[in-house]
Amino acid sequence: MKNITFIFFILLASPLYANGDRLYRADSRPPDEIKRSGGLMPRGHNEYFDRGTQMNINLYDHARGTQTGFVRYDDGYVSTSLSLRSAHLAGQSILSGYSTYYIYVIATAPNMFNVNDVLGVYSPHPYEQEVSALGGIPYSQIYGWYRVNFGVIDERLHRNREYRDRYYRNLNIAPAEDGYRLAGFPPDHQAWREEPWIHHAPQGCGNSSRTITGDTCNEETQNLSTIYLREYQSKVKRQIFSDYQSEVDIYNRIRDEL
């Protein structure tokens, strides 16, 4: 057992300890609470339903956070890490007041953006190796979790019985090109006049002209992000319906053969 533990923490200490189709998030909430919430939802999700506050789905605002370093109250993204090690370091920093917390293992999907790839040199915290999930992470997308007690990660990965591999199999995070127009830089930010963002600037951003409706740069970014999120959600729903229909067809075929 000592040898197994030793090997586990050697792997944990390596920056390469990452799975290409898995992401990680440290969170103080236990799995049953996450399940009741429907998954790992952005803070702005609750604000929207409780107070009618519009979610801010601006990646640059999300990455910067607030001036005090905390998550924005209207944030429309959920932060994850590329590696277990990065998530553990984040947990030890922001959850140091908890004797027990969890690191959730999450399947990748196209509503997720590598912050450093999208924001490039303007990424405010590049060392965090963050991948942000637009609109949150459903419970069915959570592969499992590790329990962390007094800073030590439990060796056992607890599998989520409600994880649906067939929904997320072969899905990857969004390519950086999909995220450039959703970057969310302020209207006059120099990034909109530089490569690669200059070719993806929404109307009203940088040197791009205003929209016909007169929307500002921020409003246009919000609109584009909303459209992107809805298209992704529709894709997942179609996949769920397709799988359900396939199961019904199989059931009917077996019934007819009996």
Curated annotation (Swiss-Prot):
Keywords: Disulfide bond, Enterotoxin, Signal, Toxin, Virulence. Transmembrane segments: none annotated. The active site is at residue 130. One of its GO terms (cellular component) is extracellular space. Changing residue 25 to K: Abolishes toxicity. Changing residue 125 to E: Strongly reduces toxicity. Residues 1-18 form the signal peptide. GO terms for molecular function: toxin activity. Disulfide bonds join 205-217. Changing residue 81 to K: Abolishes toxicity. NAD(+) binds at residues 25-39. Changing residue 132 to E/K: Abolishes toxicity. The keyword Disulfide bond applies. It comes from the Bacteria. Pfam families: Enterotoxin_a. Belongs to the enterotoxin A family. Heterohexamer of one A chain and of five B chains. The biological activity of the toxin is produced by the A chain, which activates intracellular adenyl cyclase. This is Heat-labile enterotoxin A chain. It comes from Escherichia coli.
